[in-house]
């Protein structure tokens, strides 16, 4: 009879052997993130299916991917129209669109969720995915603010669940945070890292901590700039100039907040504050709340900390 240690080792080997090479990727959510992930996956010669309940969102995503590819092709083959067309077609031919989750995940080797940051909606989606997908399918989330342990709470097999946090715009941003929670298997994690490298990203590993690496450092930095301004210690303009010229940042914290979206910044910080109310760095900003309540969400709305034409 096998000892418990041997049994665990055999199970680990079995799990590793069962996981298949990633060829078929299903991305759920046809927004900017989902579209970008689809583009880089198809560009890496993977078979891609993009799923969204909204047909018009799928059509918009398809057109957006095509336009993005045309820009890439024009830059790569500036004087060769035929090569440009061939590049665009070769990538688009590997992307399918669908409104049916169950049908789209049944042959997937990897599922990437890129939908709204609502934990109840995500849990409902993952319940459907786990039932319809193969037992070896890797199931991941692109969440930027929610804990994997909370999202995957009801999954029966948590060993094949992990996080793939891409950055917007996906085709241009080189980083991919590969996130593992306490039950993510080594085999799953290693395959997610391999996938990241396949799609041309530099991967960094992180445990299931709020905001992972980038947002955990970046969002509190932006909020500390807000507190500096709210206390009257310096103007927004001077804070932005100081961080650009003194720290070498490409954008100051207020410019960056407007670029990210003030509603997005507020959503992330509100979620962290609810989970960790004693953490001073996660304290909400009255000014930010007021701007968001007024519909001033940054560049996308025409006004945030600054006004945009």
Swiss-Prot record:
Substrates-to-products reaction catalysed: a (3S)-3-hydroxyacyl-CoA + NAD(+) = a 3-oxoacyl-CoA + NADH + H(+)
One term under GO cellular component: mitochondrial matrix
Subcellular location(s) of the protein: Mitochondrion matrix
GO biological process: fatty acid beta-oxidation
GO MF annotation terms: 3-hydroxyacyl-CoA dehydrogenase activity; NAD+ binding
Primary location recorded for the protein, binned into one broad class: mitochondrion
Name this protein carries in UniProt: Probable 3-hydroxyacyl-CoA dehydrogenase B0272.3
Pfam family name, one: 3HCDH
PANTHER family from the UniProt entry: HYDROXYACYL-COENZYME A DEHYDROGENASE, MITOCHONDRIAL (PTHR43561:SF3), PTHR43561
EC class of the enzyme, as a word: oxidoreductase
Site (Important for catalytic activity): 165
Keywords carried by this UniProt record: Fatty acid metabolism, Lipid metabolism, Mitochondrion, NAD, Oxidoreductase
């Amino acid at each position: 009879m096998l000892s418990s240690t041997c049994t665990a080792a055999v199970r680990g080997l079995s799990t590793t052997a069962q996981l298949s090479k990633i060829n078929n990727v299903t991305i759920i959510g046809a927004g900017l993130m989902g579209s970008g992930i689809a583009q880089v996956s198809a560009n890496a010669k993977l078979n891609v299916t993009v799923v969204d309940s909204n047909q018009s969102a799928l059509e918009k995503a398809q057109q957006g991917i095509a336009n993005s590819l045309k820009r890439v092709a024009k830059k790569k083959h500036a004087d060769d129209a035929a090569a440009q067309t061939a590049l665009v077609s070769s990538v688009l031919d590997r992307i399918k669109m669908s409104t049916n989750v169950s049908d789209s995940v049944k042959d997937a080797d990897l599922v990437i969720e890129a939908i709204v940051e609502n934990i109840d909606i995500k849990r409902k989606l993952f319940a459907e995915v786990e039932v319809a997908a193969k037992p070896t399918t890797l199931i991941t989330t692109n969440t930027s603010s929610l804990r994997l342990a909370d999202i995957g709470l009801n999954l029966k097999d948590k060993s094949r669940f992990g996080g793939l946090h891409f950055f917007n715009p996906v085709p241009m941003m080189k980083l991919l945070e590969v996130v593992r929670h306490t039950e993510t298997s080594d085999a799953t994690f290693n395959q997610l890292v391999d996938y990241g490298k396949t799609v041309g990203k530099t991967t960094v590993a992180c445990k299931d901590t709020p905001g992972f690496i980038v947002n955990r450092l970046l969002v509190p930095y932006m909020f500390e700039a807000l507190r500096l301004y709210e206390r009257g210690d310096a103007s927004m303009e001077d804070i932005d100039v100081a961080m650009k010229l003194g720290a070498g940042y490409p954008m100051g914290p207020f410019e960056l907040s407007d670029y990210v979206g003030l509603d997005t910044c507020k959503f992330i910080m509100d979620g962290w504050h609810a989970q960790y109310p004693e953490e001073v760095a996660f304290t909400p900003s009255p000014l930010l709340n007021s701007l968001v309540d007024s519909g001033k969400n940054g560049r996308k709305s025409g006004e945030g900390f600054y006004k945009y034409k």
